Amino acid sequence: KSLSEAKSICKEIGYPVLIKAAGGGGGKGMKIVEEEGKLESLFLTAKSEAKKFFNNDELYIEKYFKNPRHIEVQIMSGKNKTVQLGERDCSVQRRHQKLIEETPSPVITDDERKNLLEKTVKMVEQINYEGAGTVEYIYENGNFYFLEMNTRVQVEHPVTEVQTGIDIVKEQLWIAFTGETALKQSDINPRGHTIECRINAENPSLNFQPSPGTISVCHQPSGFRTRVDGSVF
């Protein structure tokens, strides 16, 4: 909440650090601080942006990794059990916003995957979570670092749906009504490789500035195992 508190935290975890808006998302209000001399100005800027975008100027600080991968695990959890639906690799980003999501991750080993999925299930079970959720991690040099848990159905959930054949929204509603998940871990049989690409209204000639306007022509891709989620027809 204060600059003095921020300095203390940064000293404890070591630079570089990432300052993030506590009530935010979508890459807004995020600042990378390479050294202590830059902390004050970036802290105040992040605080101002957090207030502007989210009406909440609280910030949190975490260790910044220079060459990380963003790996997340999809789970469905009820009073009876927790089931994992595999991981997604969301490392291709611009301005901290996801552009490409894929599963399985091309960078982690089978042993790393097994360990990650098992530990994620145990963590979710310990907090007695109910519903669909995504547990997010930073991965670097063979190590996973817990980032956050998104307690909702995420934009990239179709990647997992195509890969597993599981309707995540349907299962979320089932858990909401019954308190339990009808899935079994043995039901989850991922197949192939699935990639999702987000289409954004941006102008690449102007450093990807927002470029809203009327869509006059829309030709959507099609073909075997091709899925389009959107509001343009």
Spell out what each predicted region is.
Residues 1-29:
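A conserved helix-loop-beta module that forms one wall/lid of the active-site cleft
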